[in-house]
Amino acid sequence: MEVAALFFMIVAMLLIGTPIAVALGLSSITFLLVLSDTSLASIAQTFFQAMAGHYTLLAIPFFILASSFMSTGGVAKRIIRFSIAIVGHFPGGLAIAGVFACMLFAALSGSSPATVVAIGTIVIAGMRQVGYSKDFAAGVIANAGTLGILIPPSIVMVVYASATDVSVGRMFLAGVIPGLLAGTMLMVTIYVIAKIRNLPKGEWLGWQEVFASGLDAIWGLFLIVIILGGIYGGIFTPTEAAAVAAVYAFLVATFIYRDMGPLATPEGQPNIPIWRKPQALLTAFVHRDTRDALFQAGKLTITLMFIIANALILKHVLTDEQIPQQIASSMLSAGFGPIMFLVVVNVILLIGGQFMEPSGLIVIVAPLVFPIAMELGIDPIHLGIIMVVNMEIGMITPPVGLNLFVTSGVAGMPMMRVVKAALPFLAVLFVFLILVTYVPVLSTWLPNTFMGPELITK
């Protein structure tokens, strides 16, 4: 009964418009004070215990900072040019190139909203110029942007790994095949629609443009090699890889591409050689562009970590009340097998994803369903990818789908119009969710092959 009161408080606060983090934290603290034996003096200790051991979360601010520099530094323009050179000549070529560019940028940013902003700002305008409807363009980008949390490195995967104490490296590997499959399914869908509607296609620009655009984008794309190669080559931990990625992204954006900082020039003008402005080596660190990128990354980090911190308090309360064990006992005694259990998990996450930010929802739900999944023999990495895919869908379902709001701003469209535009492609993601849920080898083959199965010792 007490736990029902806790969830009632959370839902009631969300319904009256209380921010998610405040609703989670305030409800949990009220529960500790009123409905449990915990004293006010012990709440700080409870908060400390909730945060203790989650050192993997240190990777999040660095990945956000790397994404901020990459978004500011014009890497997106080069990735889009490269994508158009490769797939732009197919029917619906610019839309397909938009999805391909989102896949590449997702491997740099780890964030869906950042992917929508960086790629959508350019691609939606370009699609309108060559004859696509604004609705079609917005629907493509809203859905393709969700790949930002599925293709590694992914901030949401880091949160899941921290909440369940599984390997971040295995989670990143597990996201590769599903990420490529989701992107391919979206591109094939666009191709079929383009053939039916006779949508415009570009010209084949030749291998010279492919190589030229690839060389132009290679410094940005090399970040993928640094992160994944560093982790799986045993050079970095995931947290160290995130920190190195942030430094590398700053150097590329400021000193190589020179799209930000003291060496930046208006588009179409030649770059300023470093020897003509040597003071840039120092002033770049305090330049307005750098400060802006740091400020934006800091705001997002504080928002995200505040949600996670309050969700961890709720997780701590639920664990103390032995809620996961009670749920596991009830479901197992009711005869739930793996198939039915995964149906229930998907329903819970799809509903929750409509109202909550992905990281906070995972911190709450993962500890509840994780013990049951282990009892049923479900691979913890497979469970993690299922949860991430559900979070993808949650980001494009109202009323709180973040990608819908971001796409609405980028495309200059009312939110409900973006929702309607995204629906046809949302159906593709539902089919993809079924595949990922019931074909576990899609998620487990790479991590099991290269790193062995995840071993849960507690």
Q: Which functions belong to the PLM regions below?
A:
Residues 1-458:
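Alpha-helical transmembrane segments of multi-pass membrane transport proteins
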